[in-house]
Amino acid sequence: MPLPRAYLGTAQPPASVKEFYFVRHGATDLNEKEMHLQGEKHWGVQGAGTNIGLNGTGKRQAVLAGNVLRKLPIGSVVCSPLLRAIQTALIANIGFLCFDIDEDLKERDFGKHEGGYGPLKMFEDNYPDCEDTEMFSLRVAKALTHAKNENTLFVSHGGVLRVIAALLGVDLTKEHTNNGRVLHFRRGFSHWTVEIHQSPVILVSGSNRGVGKAIAEDLIAHGYRLSLGARKVKDLEVAFGPQDEWLHYARFDAEDHGTMAAWVTAAVEKFGRIDGLVNNAGYGEPVNLDKHVDYQRFHLQWYINCVAPLRMTELCLPHLYETGSGRIVNINSMSGQRVLNPLVGYNMTKHALGGLTKTTQHVGWDRRCAAIDICLGFVATDMSAWTDLIASKDMIQPEDIAKLVREAIERPNRAYVPRSEVMCIKEATR
């Protein structure tokens, strides 16, 4: 609900305001408190007189905001002096060595009500022992003069955001006012608009252990929203905790196309988009040409290593095309580039996976969707436990691969790298 004109009093937006960004601080414990008194809903009150820090949810929101902000053309940063706003700016790690503090970006002062509970009227109108709404609006309008410089980022509070929106004649939804949202205010021909920017959504298969788990952990730490697939959802819950606003789990069976379709549908329903797919799940049990070829095992290897990535690619491509910068990362193997052993099943299927990557790149190029092969040598996981060519401590670590995957996702369209070969033993280069 927009603030009424009477709330603003004589406050007016400054002249020559250019487009700017706004982030409401991450959540605090008071943000999450509410109660009913005599049948009326009351909310936790934290204004200029309450200087508390972010809770766990708020810190996570700041990390996600940072993922978005680091990709935007931020010109300068201006922050409220209150701890919850400063923490948000610091945790977001926007890339600025310093930023300005402006007292006028403080939240409205709620006087003796600070730290308690208040009814809707307290936030919508003048209320006993609270800062006058006109005086509050006047100082917010003064702070808005920073936006005379293009692409200024404000890190502030919900009340400040509502005043800015009212000054500019912009209607806000509940989604706009959520903690940690990155908002872009732009002036059109005759009016202002506001757009929400959210962090990318990445699907990762086989993410409950090994390389897949390391990939997911790294993406979470860098502010991505994830939809993770594994045979048993409970394994994902053990690995990453309960699902939440930014983390989604789904059953993924590489032999069951139905689970794949259901996963992609559920991810889109939750997040509204898909920005990237990491085909990580693989099967490495030996199918040896020197011995009797186990065709049942080979069939399973073919299905998991080739058919499942193909089906996931097919399902995700329409959504990836919509982003203009979709990414598919296939976790391949150096066995898809050369042959060092008689393990014909693994060698064949990994060569075939490379063919899928190349074909996907051919199909996706004009839609700005890139496919990348990351070809691994020996990685310190169960899949490499059989070799005596190199000690586990000298093998590639899962965390090394996770960083390469994130770099592949973040690399701009103008700098396509089709394949990364990752080695830990001396080999001839190709």
Curated annotation (Swiss-Prot):
Q: Where does NAD(+) bind?
A: 203-227
Q: Which residues form a coiled coil?
A: none
Pathway the protein takes part in = Opine metabolism; mannopine biosynthesis
Matches recorded under PROSITE patterns: ADH_SHORT
Q: Name one GO molecular function term.
A: oxidoreductase activity
Q: Quick one: which residues bind substrate?
A: 333
Q: Which GO terms describe its biological process?
A: lipid metabolic process; monocarboxylic acid metabolic process
Q: Its biological function?
A: Reduces deoxy-fructosyl-glutamine to mannopine.
**Assigned protein family:** Belongs to the short-chain dehydrogenases/reductases (SDR) family.
Question: What protein name applies here?
Answer: Agropine synthesis reductase
UniProt organism field? Rhizobium rhizogenes (Agrobacterium rhizogenes)
